[in-house]
Amino acid sequence: MPEYRSKTSTHGRNMAGARALWRATGVMETDFGKPIIAVANSFTQFVPGHVHLHNMGQLVAREIEKAGAIAKEFNTIAIDDGIAMGHSGMLYSLPSRDLIADSIEYMVNAHCADALVCISNCDKITPGMLIAAMRLNIPTIFVSGGPMEAGKVIGVANIQPERRLDLIDAMIESADDNVSNRQVEEVEQNACPTCGSCSGMFTANSMNCLTEALGLSLPGNGSYLATHVGRKELFLEAGRMIVEITKRYYEQNDETVLPRSIATKKAFENAMTMDIAMGGSTNTILHLLAVANEAGVDFKMADIDRLSRVVPCICKTAPNNHDYYMEDVHRAGGIFAILKELDKAGKLHTDVHTIHAPTLKDAIEKWDITNPENTRAIERFKAAPGGVRTTQAFSQNRMWKTLDLDREKGCIRDVAHAYSQDGGLAVLFGNIAERGCVVKTAGVDESILKFTGRARVFESQEDAVEGILGNQIVAGDIVIIRYEGPKGGPGMQEMLYPTSYLKSKGLGKACALLTDGRFSGGTSGLSIGHASPEAAEGGAIGLVHEGDTVEIDIPNRSIHLAISDEELAARRAEMEARGSKAWKPENRDRYVSAALRAYGAMATSADKGAVRDVAQIER
């Protein structure tokens, strides 16, 4: 029987000093002996997805205390990728994932906490917390802040029809010379109307949905709107459940509740299957690889490639389809409705554990909104947007009169009526990306699934943006942005502005973009990222010349630099001859702090999840 970790600092004569300090935090004499639950919050006033989390930690803490445990809250950092986008701030986004994981490890281990509640929401926070959960392997539950409501705009002078929109619309229209300042202002003011993570299937919502599929969060975690009063129950239930599973582990020796027992290879395959079926952010590939690495699970790019060939796309939301947003996914039954359709098609491992059900199969049946006996599920998924601008959680209680049960033409479809039988994400291989690169096929127009074009080479995102806005890019070009990988950036910037500006210039279906950097979950179009190995690690993307021909074939999962093997070898030899200047960008003026240089020195390429090269530490 495992012993409560917290006894290290709460029991024994020699811990009198530690107990004195515990008492000073509010621990009473009768509390000693109870499990100590760490509540890792990520509240910040910088991020709309986190601005409403201020009281969430204490909400969970009070419920933990009612259930018979001690709750202690602390905070992690949280970076808003949208605000950090398009300038040097984006260099810090991916590295913050490691800082978040480390900070949770430090706090939990330093204070000998027995279990963990992770209150997350946005892009790097959820994966950072997942990495920490796998590293610590103590009872853990995730509960996120929830998605924001979709924006809505009537149109200039009420002439245009009403349409829903999101952050990406503001970015695209701001760079379109055909859009007036008044129109841009209207979109800007209405794109993000409430607190919560951005309203489409971007990285934040993708990751929160994946925690459901992994089995580490409650049903509705990824789709229940931040503003809805019903979401409060997720936080309260998380507080009760963490105490239950903590006691099951420490008092009943039930190891099935531990993160590594839940997040097995089968669970990672389930999560990736769900992500492919939804056409989620390509960032999820990066993060799942990193989380699996921390969990000691052999889950690689080859597994993702295998799944991408057999999983259909059965749910397509913004930015890939502006008919649907996360609020529509929720109305259609949320993640468990998607999992049900995938299970019916034999695409899931349903014998895996979850924190809230003995098996995933049990959970799918319990949360099936098509079963009239599941009244709790039906009530939960009727939660609707309130349509009122607010930064307050639980501020409205509007409910849909009906659910979206249309599995032929609705938001979530059965496999027979899938948007495409080929999934929403794909891994491409070729001489320009020997260890793979990724593309969100759900966002690629069918007319350009095969594309051959002229390489236009840029050695920084800034130069690429300047080239696009300066009308240097024309139809048929393939924009190559290199030295933006985890090591080369350093920090692996997102390329949302270049892809958005290509759309602004009317080139969204006429050009492609290839990078060793990554993309925002809001990206769509023929945008191929994570080219591995990256240029700074000796990848062939660093050997592309201006004007080269690049051939992209998504159906056959290939990407090819159209030069001979001999020419490629000659270019590599020429690069190596540059000595200390080899595999570094030419003429790039970028300040890189010591903190970022330290990150880059230990970072691996994207095919490994951009995790630290631990071998360097152990030398």
UniProtKB/Swiss-Prot annotation:
GO terms for molecular function: 2 iron, 2 sulfur cluster binding; dihydroxy-acid dehydratase activity; magnesium ion binding. GO terms for cellular component: cytosol. It holds the Pfam family ILVD_EDD_N. Disulfide bonds: none annotated. It comes from the Bacteria. Binds 1 [2Fe-2S] cluster per subunit. This cluster acts as a Lewis acid cofactor. It is an enzyme of class 4 (lyase). The active site is at residue 520. This is Dihydroxy-acid dehydratase. Transmembrane segments: none annotated. Functions in the biosynthesis of branched-chain amino acids. Catalyzes the dehydration of (2R,3R)-2,3-dihydroxy-3-methylpentanoate (2,3-dihydroxy-3-methylvalerate) into 2-oxo-3-methylpentanoate (2-oxo-3-methylvalerate) and of (2R)-2,3-dihydroxy-3-methylbutanoate (2,3-dihydroxyisovalerate) into 2-oxo-3-methylbutanoate (2-oxoisovalerate), the penultimate precursor to L-isoleucine and L-valine, respectively. Mg(2+) binds at residues 81, 123-124, 494. Homodimer. It catalyses: (2R)-2,3-dihydroxy-3-methylbutanoate = 3-methyl-2-oxobutanoate + H2O; (2R,3R)-2,3-dihydroxy-3-methylpentanoate = (S)-3-methyl-2-oxopentanoate + H2O. GO terms for biological process: isoleucine biosynthetic process; L-valine biosynthetic process. Its cofactor is [2Fe-2S] cluster; Mg(2+). Keywords: 2Fe-2S, Amino-acid biosynthesis, Branched-chain amino acid biosynthesis, Iron, Iron-sulfur, Lyase, Magnesium, Metal-binding. It comes from Neisseria meningitidis serogroup C / serotype 2a (strain ATCC 700532 / DSM 15464 / FAM18). Belongs to the IlvD/Edd family. Pathway: Amino-acid biosynthesis; L-isoleucine biosynthesis; L-isoleucine from 2-oxobutanoate: step 3/4; Amino-acid biosynthesis; L-valine biosynthesis; L-valine from pyruvate: step 3/4. The keyword Amino-acid biosynthesis applies.
